[in-house]
């Protein structure tokens, strides 16, 4: 992989800057935007970026840091899903707590925001409390967002219980946007000043990158990633007025800044040290870029990937038509097209050939996979296995220099699995999934040295790019994700079935 980002330089610069900021206060509430762990978007657009950079940064500061996790009650009620992992936000909170503990980081508590006694939320609270995790319930803030006098009073932030903390840096994070991180920080700020403590607020958000140009593909890729939130990158006019310097921020932060500044000034009783929303941030990611051209190309590929993702989400009914069109428009404005993703044309051309050969209207799934050396392989779905499984087998054969004619998995292993699916479990689709084929391959590897060699090549697939001519099942997507393969899909279902396509 060509590197465009210096991870070590970034970690050094970022930790130094956070410590400089905390020196001004007894306690700093640091709102962490984006993903704390497994930031796959940042990894894709900044080749060389460590997907767990933020948590490694916190680990470096662990003696000074404790963590509060926010979760909006409404997201629990409607089972909101974290797209990159296919798990609900409440389950992601449990995963996040485990991961943070794995890095020796102290999780102070979980805050349920905009709580109003929702039944599913109460069950989740019980689950946490019975495992020894502190939970705080914050109701919707009275007067928010415009009535500053009510917000900063005992009727507003004062109604929220105060979260007891002991360390100088309190990181406030969440599974996703709209979880109430900012409100939790400001509520704590209110309580700190009522207690005579000097506390501060800052924001750590990786994107948009304030010190790269507005129309840089890196910042446009952020717009593409948040197309459902309707985020738009803008020049921070407050920053320009204060310092006569251009900085990039996004519409929500710029629009909310005047009110946010007034709230902070009302809480502290003095003029805010922040002249702009950019001032509030502590992000130094732009200083880690070492090859701008590599970052630009990676960001363009991400814009195409996001357009495919949004098209599939529209087909599934997850996003509206406006979101779908906006993702496509962003791609076109950058003079990009779907076919600029190298794996798209080989997959579509092979699928068209198969359709012509079969002389049927049925769709056949073809998956194209680009390997690290630039080789593009394809795999097709059959009665025996899915296209995802076929292309993975072809890839490990390629890396192991195994002839295409050699079967890696014995029919003695395959037939009982297919019979189990069809006859015992009553499955409508007996073709083996990618995960099932990999399990079968691992069984064969115990007695077949060739299969064992092929198994050893699976780690080489990490970072590869793939494209499917049909929408993959959640299970198939997750298997590719575990292998470290970035996959896109054409927004077409494999059949007319409504339930059996999921």
Curated annotation (Swiss-Prot):
Domain of life of the native organism: Bacteria
Alphabetical list of Pfam families matching this protein: DUF1846 (PF08903), DUF1846_C (PF20921)
HAMAP family: UPF0371
Family, similarity comment: Belongs to the UPF0371 family.
NCBIfam families reported in the protein's UniProt record: PRK13663.1
Protein's name in the database: UPF0371 protein CLM_0396
């Amino acid at each position: 992989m060509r590197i465009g980002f210096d991870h070590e330089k970034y970690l050094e610069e970022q930790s130094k800057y956070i410590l400089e900021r905390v020196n001004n206060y007894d306690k700093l509430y640091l709102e962490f935007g984006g993903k704390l762990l497994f930031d796959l978007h940042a990894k894709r657009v900044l080749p060389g970026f460590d997907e767990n950079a933020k948590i490694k940064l916190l680990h470096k500061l662990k003696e000074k840091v404790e963590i509060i996790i926010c979760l909006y009650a409404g997201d629990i009620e409607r089972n909101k899903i974290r797209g990159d992992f296919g798990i609900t936000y409440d389950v992601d909170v449990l995963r996040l707590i485990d991961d943070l503990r794995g890095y020796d980081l102290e999780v102070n508590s979980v805050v349920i925001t905009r709580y109003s006694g929702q039944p599913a939320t109460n069950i989740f609270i019980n689950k946490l409390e019975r495992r020894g995790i502190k939970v705080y319930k914050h109701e919707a803030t009275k007067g928010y967002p415009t009535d500053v006098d009510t917000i900063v009073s005992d009727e507003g932030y004062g109604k929220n219980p105060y979260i007891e903390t002991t360390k100088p840096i309190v990181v406030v994070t969440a599974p996703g946007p709209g979880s109430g991180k900012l409100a939790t920080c400001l509520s704590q700020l209110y309580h700190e000043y009522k207690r005579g403590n000097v506390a501060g607020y800052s924001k750590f958000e990786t994107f948009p990158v304030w010190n790269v140009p507005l129309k840089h593909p890196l910042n446009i890729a952020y717009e593409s990633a948040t197309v459902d939130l309707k985020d738009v990158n803008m020049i921070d006019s407050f920053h320009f007025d204060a310092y006569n310097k251009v900085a990039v921020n996004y519409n929500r932060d710029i629009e909310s800044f005047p009110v946010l500044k007034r709230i902070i000034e009302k809480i502290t009783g003095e003029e805010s040290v922040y002249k702009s929303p950019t001032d509030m941030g502590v992000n130094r990611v732009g200083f880690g870029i070492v090859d701008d051209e590599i970052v630009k190309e990676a960001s363009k590929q991400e814009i195409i990937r996001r357009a495919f993702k949004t098209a599939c989400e529209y087909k599934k009914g997850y996003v509206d038509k406006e979101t779908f069109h906006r993702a496509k428009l962003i791609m076109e404005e950058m003079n990009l097209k779907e076919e600029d993703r190298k794996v798209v044309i080989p997959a579509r051309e092979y699928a068209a050939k198969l359709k012509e050969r079969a002389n049927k209207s049925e769709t056949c799934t073809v998956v194209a996979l680009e390997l690290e050396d630039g080789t593009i392989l394809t795999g097709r779905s059959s009665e025996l296995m899915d296209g995802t499984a076929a292309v993975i087998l072809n890839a490990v054969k390629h890396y192991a220099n195994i002839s295409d004619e050699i079967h890696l998995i014995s029919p003695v292993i395959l037939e009982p699995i297919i019979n189990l699916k069809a006859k015992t479990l009553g499955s409508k689709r007996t073709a083996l999934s990618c995960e099932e084929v990999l399990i079968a391959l691992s069984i064969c590897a115990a007695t077949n040295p060739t299969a064992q060699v092929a198994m050893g090549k699976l780690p080489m697939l990490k970072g590869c790019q793939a494209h499917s001519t049909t929408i993959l099942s959640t299970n198939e997507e997750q298997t590719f994700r575990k292998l470290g393969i970035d996959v896109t899909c054409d927004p077409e279902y494999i059949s007319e079935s409504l339930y059996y396509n999921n």
